[in-house]
Amino acid sequence: MDSILVKGNGELRGQIPIAGAKNACLALMPATLLSDEPLTLTNAPRLSDIRTMTQLLQSLGAEVASLQGGQVLALSSHALTDHRADYDIVRKMRASILVLGPMLARDGHAVVSLPGGCAIGARPVDLHLKALEAMGADLDLRDGYIHAKAPAGGLRGARVAFPIVSVGATENALMAATLAKGTTVLENAAREPEIVDLARCLRRMGAQIEGEGSATITVQGVDRLGGATHPVVTDRIELGTYMLAPAICGGEVELLGGRIELVGAFCEKLDAAGISVEETERGLRVARRNGRVKAVDVTTEPFPGFPTDLQAQMMALLCTAEGTSVLEEKIFENRFMHAPELTRMGARIEVHGGTARVTGVEKLRGAPVMATDLRASVSLILAGLAAEGETVVSRVYHLDRGYERVEEKLSACGAQIRRIPG
């Protein structure tokens, strides 16, 4: 099993290109199941989760070709051979559930295993299922699988009011609604850029959608969808992660393809901590102002609030801030599993339920640490960049699910980092 070796204590200077958004691409790929015409995605990230979704779609009979080194995906579902998404594939990634709505909407039936993925608290699929039930689907959970059937004549438009904001449930309902009979209104819908990106792609395919980016999305169902070519939106989580690298280490880095509107609430916290963020012609330039980073309080919220997927990385920054910071996690349970690993590096962190209290220290110390999930893995790498001595991060297979070429991108800016094959 591979690990990452980081030698800290140096400034970073240079440019880092930001990839297409993993979370957007994982929703866009199943959209091919809605049509028998080709869907081409450009600016696709090259990640293990994308390969898992490719494997899942191919198991259903879809064709997926990876072109231009993986940056272009050519998909076609003109002749599905199966409507069963097996546990052996689905268990690897929670986004696998996103094949349910499209298959049900287009062909009227689907069998999908309950998903796996990151071990972060309770992330139930109930919201997905209730949305599809509102459209008339008959659902039966047995033997670890969701058995779904559409009513005679197909799914029906409906009013779907989500009790809590859910990105995945919004995506599944949005895709299903494009082929439902009549009008579907999604209330308390997720507003993330990935939702907007999916809606734009579906509209290119012929869907009639209004209101994406707001809490209410209206979909007028159509009889069929066509093909399209669509660029995957910039990955705001990768963007925020690499913005923290010069914030933690010092120096100045330009993030190519970055846009303020993708990370507005995050930028506000960086500014309060003493980090400069400037727009450039090609992206964003980030530098730490003079002196030590200042403590700030952070509460994770659905977009446009502070993203939960940047909480672990932000904690790495605040471990060496002047003063005490309070981080409140309101999206997922049990999402401070990186805290004990950071304390091995000398961080002072107290966790009580969904709140972490971080008292900054002047320096972290390198240590052997273990990644517990995707975002925790990169937070430990960031901490290692600022620590004295060497840090070895094990179980980095988590990292490969969400970050492409992380060692290359950081070493190009002067970081001492390399992968140790397992």
Curated annotation (Swiss-Prot):
The text of the family note is: Belongs to the EPSP synthase family. MurA subfamily.
- Recorded protein name is UDP-N-acetylglucosamine 1-carboxyvinyltransferase
What is any one of the record's Gene Ontology cellular component terms?
cytoplasm
Q: EC number(s) in its UniProt entry?
A: 2.5.1.7
Q: Which CDD domains match?
A: UdpNAET (cd01555)
Q: Residue positions of the PTM 2-(S-cysteinyl)pyruvic acid O-phosphothioketal?
A: C118
Coiled coil regions in record: none
Do you know which InterPro entries this protein is assigned to? Enolpyruvate_Tfrase_dom, Enolpyruvate_Tfrase_sf, MurA_subfamily, RNA3'P_cycl/enolpyr_Trfase_a/b, UDP_GlcNAc_COvinyl_MurA
Residues given in the record as phosphoenolpyruvate binding sites: K22, N23
| Organism domain of life | Bacteria
Localisation: Cytoplasm
Q: What class of enzyme is it?
A: transferase
Q: Which UniProt keywords apply?
A: Cell cycle, Cell division, Cell shape, Cell wall biogenesis/degradation, Cytoplasm, Peptidoglycan synthesis, Pyruvate, Transferase
Q: In which pathway does it act?
A: Cell wall biogenesis; peptidoglycan biosynthesis
Database matches in Gene3D superfamilies:
Enolpyruvate transferase domain (3.65.10.10)
An individual GO BP term: cell division
HAMAP family from the UniProt entry: MurA
Family matches, as Pfam families: EPSP_synthase
Q: Which SUPFAM superfamilies does the record match to this protein? A: EPT/RTPC-like
User: Any idea which positions bind UDP-N-acetyl-alpha-D-glucosamine?
Assistant: R94, R123, P124, V125, D126, L127, D309, I331
Reactions mediated catalytically: phosphoenolpyruvate + UDP-N-acetyl-alpha-D-glucosamine = UDP-N-acetyl-3-O-(1-carboxyvinyl)-alpha-D-glucosamine + phosphate
Tell me which residues this entry annotates as catalytic.
Answer: C118 (proton donor)
Q: Name one GO molecular function term.
A: UDP-N-acetylglucosamine 1-carboxyvinyltransferase activity
Main role? Answer: Cell wall formation. Adds enolpyruvyl to UDP-N-acetylglucosamine.
